[in-house]
From Swiss-Prot:
CDD domains: Chorismate_synthase (cd07304)
Binding site for NADP(+): 40, 46
Function: This reaction introduces a second double bond into the aromatic ring system.
GO CC terms: cytosol
Protein name from the UniProt record: Chorismate synthase
Catalytic activity: 5-O-(1-carboxyvinyl)-3-phosphoshikimate = chorismate + phosphate
């Protein structure tokens, strides 16, 4: 089974991603990973740290000459600011006298509302929020994006599947409700300052960010990930944890600052009558076709051959420049929350991270369905399955013809 895990702190020496269970023979390079990490840095409203926190990628294991080996893949993303933090974030004990005059080591005792600071300090017995915020930081998503690059490569090479995303809305901007983008639209989306597919909405999104920045505030928004080219039958109806929608929702909700997930038309479907909530089927030249995709490519926990659509709602960033009211846990007094440098809006970047988690879940589902130790073996298994599906859909194709 495909598994992944990340390690590292925001200001630590490095982040590390480990991917286990990937078949041999998938072509992926450190340049591919760096390209995806660069996409994660995109977006109007990002903070100054995006200009100096470079992502230095080193593949430690599992890939040789640009091809996966079948063993665990370890990827390191170095922190170019490490020399500034080496004493504060050292793994081994440091002489207190050496730390006494280091401003970066000052205890952070005023938790930020909306962040992991408060609950993390109480749960783990910390007198300082530093150990919490270092791991809870969205900087960790860089390691996920690195892992997801391997999953993307597998999906593309094994199944011809492409995963992309775009921003639906930022703040109070009008949400985009048109058709989802296609694979060829991704370069234009990434070229947009807010990663918007709808150019008409771009100016409104930018204006929302500018207004929030002027007011010393932050903004959230909604992104949509789309997976194109999926076969019928990934996932299962047999048990709740085997349903692909439950796996996707869990993976996307696990991203920092994501507060809601919907598949397809999601909550809109709940307001419709059944006759207008589902996707009717008709005979087509290659089998069954549909005129709508309200289900977002999933029915009964399984892919149905339609484009997969997953939307995620991101809350405004918890580190608010004008600072929110809190309690100093060292004294019990009223206080204003600590302020770390941060973004005004990270919604465009969140779309890339949502893509990543969708790709990882889909790659796992595909490997569970088709198996194999090498890409070539998996491709043979996929081809046999697709022939079987085509045979079962042949009656509909004959009727259409």
């Amino acid at each position: 089974m495909l598994r992944w895990i990340t390690a590292g702190e925001s200001h630590g020496r490095a982040l590390v991603a480990v991917v286990e269970g990937m078949v041999a023979g998938v072509h992926v390079t450190s340049a591919d990973i760096a390209d995806q990490l660069a996409r994660r840095r995109l977006g109007y409203g990002r903070g100054a740290r995006m200009t100096f926190e470079r992502d230095a990628v080193t593949v430690l294991s599992g890939i040789r000459h640009g091809s996966t080996l079948g063993g665990p893949i370890a990827i390191e993303i170095g922190n170019t600011e490490w020399p500034k933090w080496e004493t504060v974030m050292a793994a081994d004990p440091v002489d207190p006298a050496e730390l006494a005059d280091v401003a970066r080591n000052a205890p952070l005792t005023r938790p930020r509302p909306g962040h992991a600071d408060y609950a993390g300090m109480l749960k783990y017995g910390f007198d300082d929020a530093r150990p919490v915020l270092e791991r809870a930081s969205a900087r960790e998503t860089a390691a996920r994006v690195a892992a997801g690059t391997v999953a993307r490569a597998f999906l593309r090479q094994a199944l011809g599947v492409e995963v992309l995303s775009h921003v639906i809305s930022i703040g109070a901007s009008a949400p985009y409700e048109g058709p989802p983008p296609r694979a060829e639209d991704l370069p234009a989306i990434d070229a947009s300052p807010v990663r918007a597919y709808d150019k008409a909405a771009e100016a409104d999104m930018i204006a929302q960010i500018e207004a929030a920045k002027k007011d010393g505030d932050t903004l959230g928004g909604v992104v949509e990930a789309v997976a194109l080219g999926l076969p019928v039958g990934l996932g299962s109806f047999t048990s709740g944890d085997h349903r692909l929608d439950s796996q996707l929702a869990a993976a996307v909700m696990g991203i920092q600052a994501i507060k809601g997930v919907e598949i397809g038309d999601g909550f809109q479907t709940a307001r419709r009558r059944g006759s207008r909530a589902h996707d009717e089927m008709y005979p087509g030249p290659d089998g069954v076709v549909r005129s709508t995709n309200r289900a977002g490519g999933l029915e009964g926990g399984m892919t149905n051959g339609q484009p997969l659509r997953v939307r995620a709602a991101m809350k405004p960033i918890s580190t608010v420049p004008r600072a929110l009211a809190t309690v100093d846990l060292a004294t019990g007094d009223e206080a204003v929350a600590i302020h770390q440098r941060s973004d005004v809006c990270a919604v465009p970047a969140a779309g890339v991270v949502v893509e990543t988690m969708v790709a990882l879940v889909l790659a796992r589902a595909a490997l569970e369905k088709f198996g194999g130790d090498s890409l070539a073996e998996t491709q043979r298994n996929i081809a046999a399955y697709q022939r079987s599906v085509a045979d079962r859909e042949a009656p509909a194709a004959r009727v259409s013809g």
